[in-house]
């Protein structure tokens, strides 16, 4: 049984690191898409005339 003072399993540390990275990237993507600077984004399909 692990106690709080013992070192965590390396697999758990790697899993938590990957999860934190994915959450950070998802948050950044949502902030970019819907945040204050989203008004400056343009749709390339609308800009292209056929």
Swiss-Prot record:
**Keywords recorded for this protein, A-Z:** Membrane, Thylakoid, Transmembrane, Transmembrane helix
Entry keyword annotation includes Acetylation: no
GO terms, biological process: photosynthesis
Q: Which cysteines are joined by disulfide bonds?
A: none
Its localization reads:
Cellular thylakoid membrane
> Per the record, GO CC terms?
plasma membrane-derived thylakoid membrane
InterPro entries listed in its UniProt record: PSII_PsbN
Tell me which Pfam families the record gives: PsbN
Task: Specify where it is mainly localized.
Answer: membrane
Q: Give TM segment ranges.
A: 14-34
The topology of this chain with respect to the membrane is: Single-pass membrane protein
Purpose: May play a role in photosystem I and II biogenesis.
- What's this protein's family per the entry? Belongs to the PsbN family.
What name goes with this protein?
Protein PsbN
> Which lineage?
Bacteria, Bacillati, Cyanobacteriota, Cyanophyceae, Synechococcales
């Amino acid at each position: 049984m692990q106690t709080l003072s013992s070192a965590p399993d390396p697999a758990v540390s790697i899993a938590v690191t990957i999860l934190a990275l994915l959450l950070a990237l998802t948050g950044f993507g949502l902030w970019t898409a819907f945040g204050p600077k989203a008004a400056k984004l343009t749709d390339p399909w609308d800009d292209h005339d056929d």
